[in-house]
Amino acid sequence: MAIETAIFAGGCFWCMVQPFDSLDGIEKVRSGYTGGHVENPTYEQVLTHTTGHTEAVKIWFDSEKISYRELVEIYWEQTDPTDAMGQFQDRGDNYRPVIFVNSPEQREIAEESRAALAASNRFDEPIVTKIEDAKPFYEAEEYHQDFYKKDPEREALEMAQRLQFKADKWN
């Protein structure tokens, strides 16, 4: 077993857990905040747009069962990579799409994948998802963890626009 981590920001972190959580080779997925300048921020602080943080998920995966490249491909299908200031109904810099990389290898994979997506002409607008070096990841409050299991009806409401976009662009 070779456990590695991936950090993806793609709008509301509630909507980013389930697509990864059920995959073979995923050990754990946690919602949290990263990319900012405030240590141990709270949800309320992040909502003020003054911390620099974005909502994200940190994924612990067994790279012998699922590759980082596969995770990046799954990530693209969960987001609108042409929207730099939020995702779907969630607006603002705390919902911006970012792939946070932990190594030069992850950066190379993410950049190659972004270039391939741009060249695919799947989207009419340019791909604006950022690729940034990973910064400290602060786990969100417990009530945010595994939200799709705790409140499936609310999760379904949050996911509606995302799922329609996915059906339109990826199927």
From Swiss-Prot:
E.C. designation(s): 1.8.4.11
Regions crossing the membrane: none
UniProt entry keywords in alphabetical sequence: Oxidoreductase
Principal EC category: oxidoreductase
Reactions it catalyzes: L-methionyl-[protein] + [thioredoxin]-disulfide + H2O = L-methionyl-(S)-S-oxide-[protein] + [thioredoxin]-dithiol; [thioredoxin]-disulfide + L-methionine + H2O = L-methionine (S)-S-oxide + [thioredoxin]-dithiol
GO molecular function: L-methionine:thioredoxin-disulfide S-oxidoreductase activity; peptide-methionine (S)-S-oxide reductase activity
Gene3D superfamilies: Peptide methionine sulphoxide reductase MsrA
Active site location: C12
GO BP terms in the entry: protein modification process
Record family assignment: Belongs to the MsrA Met sulfoxide reductase family.
HAMAP family (alphabetical): MsrA (MF_01401)
Function: Has an important function as a repair enzyme for proteins that have been inactivated by oxidation. Catalyzes the reversible oxidation-reduction of methionine sulfoxide in proteins to methionine.
Name of the molecule in the record: Peptide methionine sulfoxide reductase MsrA
Gene: msrA
